[in-house]
Amino acid sequence: MKVELSKVPILGKDVVHVGFDIADHIVDTIFQSCPSSTYVVINDTNVEKIPHYVDLCGELQAKLKSGSRILQYSVKPGEAHKTREQKAAIEDYLLSEGCTRDTVIIAVGGGVIGDMIGYVASTFMRGVRVVQVPTSLLAMVDSSIGGKTAVDTPLGKNFIGAFWQPQFVFVDIKWLETLPKREFINGIAEVIKTACIWNAEEFARLEENADLFLQVVNGSKTTQVSVQGQVHELSLTNIDAMLEHVYRLVLESIKVKTHVVSSDEREAGLRNLLNFGHTIGHAYEAILTPQALHGECVSIGMIKEAELSRYLNILSPTQVARLTKILAAYGLPISPDQKWFKDLTLNKKTPLDVLLKKMSIDKKNDGSKKKAVLLETIGKCYGTSAHVVSDEDIRFVLTDETLVYPFKTLENGQEKTIVPPGSKSISNRALILAALGEGTCKIKNLLHSDDTKHMLHAVQQLKGATITWEDNGETVVLKGHGGSTLQATAEPLYLGNAGTASRFLTSVAALVNSTSSQKSVVLTGNARMQERPIGPLVDSLRENGISIDYLNKEKSLPLKINTDSNFKGGRIELAATVSSQYVSSILMCAPYAEEPVTLALVGGKPISKLYIDMTIKMMEKFGIYVKASTEEPNTYHIPKGHYVNPPEYVIESDASSATYPLAYAAMTGTTVTVPNIGFESLQGDARFARDVLKPMGCSVTQTETSTTVTGPPVGGLKPLKHVDMEPMTDAFLTACVVAAVAHDGKEGSRNTTTIEGIANQRVKECNRILAMVDELAKFGVEANELPDGIQVHGLSSIDKLKVPEAIHSYDDHRVAMSFSLLAGMVGATKDALSEPVRILERSCTGKTWPGWWDVLHTQLGAKLDGSEPLQSAVKKNSNSSIVIIGMRAAGKTTVSSWCANALGFKFLDLDTVFEEQYKKGSVKEFVAEHGWDAFRATETKIFEESVKKYGEGYVLSTGGGIVEGAASRKSLKQFASQGGIVLHLHRDIDETIKFLNSDPTRPAYNEDIRNVWERREEWYKECANFTFYAPHCTSSTQFNQLRKTFETFIRTISGKREVKIPTNRSSFVCLTFDDLAAHKEKIPDITAGCSAVELRVDQLKSYDLDFVAKQLSILRLASSSLPIIFTIRTKSQGGQFPDDDKSTLGSLLSLALEVGVEFVDMELTLSSELQYSLVNNKRNTKIIGSHHDFDAKFDWNDSEWENRYNQALSLDVDVVKFVGTAKDFEDNLKLEQFRLQHTAKPLIAINMTDVGKMSRVLNTVLTPVTSSLLPSASAPGQLTLSQINEIYTLLGGFSAKNFYVVGSPISHSRSPVLHNTGYKILGLPHKFEKFETSSASEVKDKLLSKCKLGGLAVTIPLKLDIMEFMDELSESAKLIGAVNTVIPLGDGKFKGDNTDWLGIYNSFLANGVPENVRGNSGFVIGAGGTSRAAVYALHQLGCSDIHLVNRTVEKPHDLKKSFPSEYNLHVLEDSQQAEGISGSVALAVSCVPADKPLDDNLLARVRAVLAKAQGTSFKPTLLEAAYKPAVTPMMKTASDEFSWHIIPGSQMLVHQGVAQFQLWTGFRAPFNAIYSAVTEEQA
């Protein structure tokens, strides 16, 4: 297909040329119209990969005239390079090439290139000619036209620039062939915008072609092209398939912009109409960039600004609905809360205050006043420029939570006429009848809502009718085909929460014809829709020959209707006591049955008979006459036939919706008229004013077609003793809120209004009766349910209405609209300012009255505001309870108690709760008496009650079979989906079976245990969002290690422990074992000095999920919970994992998140699906975005790295890791330049090969290293940590520092051997020596003045004296009152710290003591300096009380006075006090000299306290602070007499020294080697 070349004038010149494949024309025009000595083509490096660019440059070169030259300059792609610095670099290049004022610059690229190069042209030589060749849709229709040029600054986009009109803008649509799909759709937003503000005809054309566009763009394919010897992957779209459409949309959009620019070049007024959608859109973009694109944010902005126009009573709801529909149809977001868009933007929050702040710096604002472009109708703006809008109104449209203020601002005698939207009931019936009918029918006043949108879409999917629009979208035109064209579709009919549509379409589906490839239709909806009943209708259709399957829950959607089965007709019996819609559904489809239908309604009195009458009357209008049986009650005869569509059908306004403005009049004492609903209405709810409001004290005037209500003075409504609302069940909610403020004035009266006949309201969008009871209670209004109704007990005064907590709408339009009325009555009669009432989910009113809030605000005068959403009850890092699931004997009870202890939660075993409720023995006895099924049902009930009752601050341990029940699984998944933790505790199944077979206390399974596991395994995975693999422990050491590992794990996944990215020089070691089990003893030495450890999953011998989980468990235990980097390196990225096994890869990456690893390496070459799955489900895990160039394809200046870096930023990874391949040494220098220019995220950037080793030395964050203990390095050129440090030292990166231990006597000090061992192993150049002195002044004079001082270890007697020379003190040093560590700060300043307490604290942790020992007391023996550190450490461990004993009693009292009262220190002066201690003492620290006999009095008190160790969840533990002798008298007493676990003093010594080492060097010390060196020396 060919399209003609079009020239569009701007400012009087034919500047814009639009065509397809016009490279020849571009070149000829430039050379003919812009003669020059120098032409400079400037583009970004991405464009160079496109063949069309090569063709264009080739044409320029081939046709260049003699005496002229062509230069070419490339810039790096992306907004990050649209800077003043880049502009200067371009200008320097032009100057260096001798470019003069006759230069012509040709800008080839997207918006970034066009903006920046235009600005270069505007200032170079005071202005040179520029030609724009836009290559993206957005640039073609927007940025290239109009002469706006700019660069970005750190403070904002486009803040520095100029207006500089190009000589030409060449729009060659061929560029769009290689535009990626998302970029294509992104540009469409601006196209829709221009049509929306200026060209209604083009807007309608865009509506008609939306399906074609999305079909073609979604069909784009990736292809490989060779450009100048290099192969590149490009997206390729078949533009030919929609060339006419794309050409037109580009051309028409350009015409709008050129016209506006020609009228207002400098944006004095008219031109800012082009900013429709941008005021709010730019605010979203500022927060969501770079994940969200400009057009995507403008799309959301257009919706919000259209809603703002509707809110201000300027734009009709129909026009908003059209705009919403077209944006969605072109694949653009219409709300920031759409799941796919939230996933794309990584679930970033868009806080209301931040959005408003971003809007405040919009260039078109009037000072502090915000301006927005308002829409009058599709194709026309309101006025000729942007309008000032209030923050209050903006806030309202930006949020789904609204604040309703008291109705105080009403005019006296206010009279309003309100026209509600078309009836939902009539709208849906009319659409079905017209679709089944023959001929064209124009339907007017159709309700434009979610329900009707789903119905229209379904009719189109089934090919039931041809649908067009007239009157600018206000009138829908259906050309029905008499049902003959109904056709099965493979795509499920998604109906949201549209109950009416679902019921009507179930019968319509029975008339659908099969195709050769499709034999069924599937109806589905949202979660609530899949709970609502449809059973009676399905039963009747099944009995009539229609084959229907439930695909999920019985009696609810989704349904699968077999289209090969026929609707036979004849007698049909239907239970109609739940919903009249079942009846209407069969009635409307009955004429198309094979035989005439007799429909008998059975099972009791039919509900809502007036709606059945409505259907029958409407069928008459379409030519089918239904006769009621004269012989049988509630029975109808429907003849065979075809509907004949009337030329026009006008939908009556919705009578249910009309109840809200009428009730508003009743409650506020004002007058409201609804002009198109009267007593002749088809709808039962038209009776509401006459049968409900009038008896309650209102004046009601009703004609055939109108209803007027005037309320009594405020507070004058009377309760209604009894009303049967069966003819108008939907209106009962409105009646309830009116009744809430109705009273009879009698003292002691309950002011009761009784409403009956509404049982069907329990199965609507929610259980409406219960919802009204619950939400009325929040206002202080009592209500109670009746079998088929509700009683509301009104308040004696409106002043008694309470300001409730947030009102929940249950995603139910009628609940929200009803409570919007009662909300305004709170405080309405009080003079003082009253708080507003918050209503949640306000947008649910879109189901029937999208503009209800606009009417309430603009027409009825209510004050509304928007508000930041309340936080969900269950949030990450909250005290949300944790549920633990797993097989019997997995260790749930033990681990749950650890979990509770670590988090400070309470522990609840649901088996224990069961036994308490059962009160007849154990679970085993219950099962023996009642069976497993009864137990499961009871267990599920208890679980659901417990989750609700103990939702915060608890650890709930469940029975192994909790996942057997579907209801329990649903509750577990719901809890997890709200941010709660459901933890699957997993053990080796063989070990579990072995244990269970030997345990007689548990009820026996009726089947093989392994079979039970195999059945439950998937259920555990389905319900849990975290997994912990607990290996079998064979010793107390392993058990303690497991506890410590678990506590670190649970604190990490719950957010109590932050995963930190190192900020100093750091490294991780890359493990290359194929199975860690045989090498776990080596892991502590392999990981020495490293900040993390990488598990190369691709190098493991098996990718089985259980095997990998075990490997992770081994690694956690062996490395003492060192942060794990989980890496699966694919073959294309230099690893061993198959590139094509995406399924296993996805499962393994999911496992990584489920087991809570600290880091996941995510290759930037993975599919978008996997990448977004990772980043959106990462929880507390950090993501490393990695890219490797093993084949040395890309120089560090190549755009590949820039594009990958921008990709990493758009994915918002936590760390970027780039690995190149060095061919020569200069590659390292280029890498360092790249590192300097890319600082937005922590960057690991290295080169492989021996030549690239230097880059590993210079890398700062998380450098990958190997170890001599590993079988091989994981990459070419990889170094050990000590090698890196040694080379870095040789380069001057590390300066040798001198460290000293100071004090006296220190001849036996182990500090030098401790620290020097660490320095040697890690390759550090430092030296540690002794400096013996008793004078702090001497230390100051001789050591603190040394320039190479690295730090001091301070011992007796200087721990107090040295403090006067410190400039800063750590919190621990202040409270302990002593310094044992001096840290130089530079400039002659020093910080004093204390690591003695860490020596004590970490020694306890290393010996199985949990991080928090809540409920247990501590014990300190002695009252010297070390005792102070012991007190501090025990408090940090969570000891509830700390008991002190000393040989003399004065010193411990002094010690007690120096600590805060919350430490709960108790001095035990005698044995009687010691024996009187209540509670358990679990930790003790001995700080008395070990080389002298113990005082008898002191020993007696010690023994009394040690005897108090009872009932702890860990073995009571005593730490001996003295490290000589190896076994002290105190150690023997505690161990031999009281069986306490003993920690020798050498451990405290090493732990406090290791803490110093890490403070001074920043490196994690090699603990095992240091400990061996210290203890060997000691021996």
UniProtKB/Swiss-Prot annotation:
CDD domains with a match to the protein in the record: DHQase_I, DHQS, EPSP_synthase, NAD_bind_Shikimate_DH, SK
Cofactor note: Binds 2 Zn(2+) ions per subunit.
UniProtKB keywords: Amino-acid biosynthesis, Aromatic amino acid biosynthesis, ATP-binding, Cytoplasm, Kinase, Lyase, Metal-binding, Multifunctional enzyme, NADP, Nucleotide-binding, Oxidoreductase, Transferase, Zinc
Domain of life according to the entry: Eukaryota
Pathway annotation from the record: Metabolic intermediate biosynthesis; chorismate biosynthesis; chorismate from D-erythrose 4-phosphate and phosphoenolpyruvate: step 2/7; Metabolic intermediate biosynthesis; chorismate biosynthesis; chorismate from D-erythrose 4-phosphate and phosphoenolpyruvate: step 3/7; Metabolic intermediate biosynthesis; chorismate biosynthesis; chorismate from D-erythrose 4-phosphate and phosphoenolpyruvate: step 4/7; Metabolic intermediate biosynthesis; chorismate biosynthesis; chorismate from D-erythrose 4-phosphate and phosphoenolpyruvate: step 5/7
Region Shikimate kinase, annotated ranges: 881-1070
Binding site for Zn(2+): 190, 278, 294
Reactions it catalyzes: 7-phospho-2-dehydro-3-deoxy-D-arabino-heptonate = 3-dehydroquinate + phosphate; 3-dehydroquinate = 3-dehydroshikimate + H2O; shikimate + NADP(+) = 3-dehydroshikimate + NADPH + H(+); shikimate + ATP = 3-phosphoshikimate + ADP + H(+)
Name assigned to this protein: Pentafunctional AROM polypeptide
Native organism: Lachancea thermotolerans (strain ATCC 56472 / CBS 6340 / NRRL Y-8284)
